[in-house]
From Swiss-Prot:
Entry similarity comment: Belongs to the COQ7 family.
Described function: Catalyzes the hydroxylation of 2-nonaprenyl-3-methyl-6-methoxy-1,4-benzoquinol during ubiquinone biosynthesis.
Cofactor: Fe cation
Protein name, entry field: 3-demethoxyubiquinol 3-hydroxylase
Length: 211
């Protein structure tokens, strides 16, 4: 098999990002909300749900960028395969959130290109240092995503049953990803790095909810 050149990799990543921006996306698994019916939602409730789901959509965009950035420079074939597999599973989450946004009459965040490529860069830097550090970023990212999802489940309008089913399944999947990364040798991140990630996450969630 021919080894990909730097230009080949750039083209491959641009093509992958282009796929993420297409609506609708094509998940490998049907949405957990497929067989669920919403109760009556007032416009103000729809707007709030849309803001929350927009944040979750952007969170999945960040996960795609991080994992693909890490995979692009992974030291071992096993790590590369693990990260691309995780990205593929996160793609389903992205599709589910995108579909729900459409149902709510809303759009994804306008800042998603920035968040994707920023996350890709962070992933590439972490991955170039060591696989264990790369896995450590996966663990911390998943834990932060789980906290967001948990808070969103508590904040969703009572009658927003479809969004709730999506987030419940996402929480389960993210938990499994964190455990798998820890088992693969994820290195515990320094407190300073965790603090920076939390700050970045706070900025992202605040902006994505509104824009």
């Amino acid at each position: 098999m021919r080894k990909l050149s730097f230009l080949d990799r750039v083209i491959e990543e641009l093509d992958s990002y282009a796929r993420f921006t297409k609506v609708p996306l094509n998940p490998s698994k049907k949405s957990p909300s497929s067989d669920t019916i919403d109760g009556k939602l007032f416009e103000i409730e729809k707007k709030h749900s849309a803001g929350l789901m927009r944040v979750d959509y952007t969170g999945e965009i960040c996960a795609q960028g991080l994992y693909r950035g890490q995979a692009s420079v992974a030291k071992s074939p096993q790590t590369k395969e693990h990260l691309y597999h995780a990205a593929a599973e996160e793609y389903d989450h992205l599709a589910w959130c995108g579909e729900r946004l459409q149902e709510l009459g809303a759009r994804p965040s306008l800042l998603n290109p920035f968040w994707y490529w920023t996350s890709f860069g962070i992933g590439a830097v972490a991955g170039s240092i060591s696989d264990s550090l790369s896995y450590g970023f996966v663990v911390e990212t998943e834990k932060q995503v789980m906290k967001h999802i948990d808070s969103h489940l508590k904040s969703l309008p009572v009658n927003d049953n479809r969004s709730r089913e999506i987030l419940k399944q996402m929480y389960i999947d993210e938990s499994e990803h964190a455990v798998e990364a820890e088992k693969a040798g994820g290195k515990k991140l320094p407190k300073t790095v965790k603090a920076i990630m939390k700050l970045q996450s706070k900025v992202m969630t605040t902006l994505a909810y509104r824009f």
